[in-house]
Amino acid sequence: MAQDPRTWRWMRQNGHESRDEFHRWWEGVDLGFAHHLDGKLVGHTSFLNDRPEDRVVEIGNTWLHPSAWGTGANTEAKYLLLKHAIEDGGYLRVEFKTDAANERSRPALLGVGAQFEGIARKHMLVRGGQRRDSAWYAVIDDDWPAAKASLERRLGYGPP
């Protein structure tokens, strides 16, 4: 999983050369959530850039092995994190950032109910010393009821 270059295409890091390296990385994650499919670890996403004084948090550092693309694992993870942040945590805004050129992630973020807010040009340094333009998205508490209902229908939670 950690050695498939497609997994890491849009990430700052190059992946992990060994299980030990992966486990060292995992230990450094503040609050991470693993995606499992058929008992195998296939991805990760986490809260980051927590600003409780503003009631804003980001969901990111997301990677998913190609074997899990299109399975709904990422959609379900985003749903659970959004639900926890807004309903349990009282956050008013949940942010997402992705490489502006990431043609898989951008529609996926729209699919979880996030609104596109613009492009931050030369936003961050990535592998190879390149600068990345980042597409910014957010779900705010006002958006959440409609986004939640849509996600629950897609995921098969509750009545149709």
Which residues fall in each region the model found?
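Amphipathic alpha-helical recognition patches that constitute DNA-binding helices
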Residues: 58, 76, 93, 104, ...
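Conserved GNAT acetyl-CoA-binding A-motif
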Residues: 87-97
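GNAT-family acyltransferases
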Residues: 1-71, 84-88, 128-160
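Conserved active-site alpha-helix within GNAT-family acetyltransferase domains
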Residues: 102-118
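Short His-Asn-centered micro-motif
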Residues: 60, 98-99
